[in-house]
Amino acid sequence: MKKLILISALLFSFNGWADDTVIEHFSSEQTIKQNFPFSDAVRVDNTIYISGMIGEDDEGNLVEGGIVPEAHTVMKTMAKILAHFNLGYNDVFKCLVMIDDISEWSLFNSVYVQYFKKPYPARSAFGADGLAGNASFELECMARIQDDD
């Protein structure tokens, strides 16, 4: 019985070594330069997890003008991240929006629909006070790399 338990334990431990999960981290030059403690995106197999983004310019400053210019900046940043993985907006299947002032929801949506087309990704949202960098909103998304079948 002890031999059976030992053999089973060894087989399970070897199975962990055979894990062929693809994990790839992506950080932009801006993220590296600012020494943020996170990646802009992480690929795990065919899923891309995009970190929360705020409307910062290339120098790391929040763009001026409020939620509309911030949203355009975030969408352009997302396009660059998606392009790193040879993806586009149509590959995004889920987003989470954290918005500082929920009364600006329609302003955010007016920009969102310029980039995402029907059928839209699944989406959750909530009001949040005190977002990073004093941003009007933060957006995080997930995308899928299609199989080559």
Report each predicted region and the residues it spans.
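Surface-exposed aromatic
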Residues: 93-95
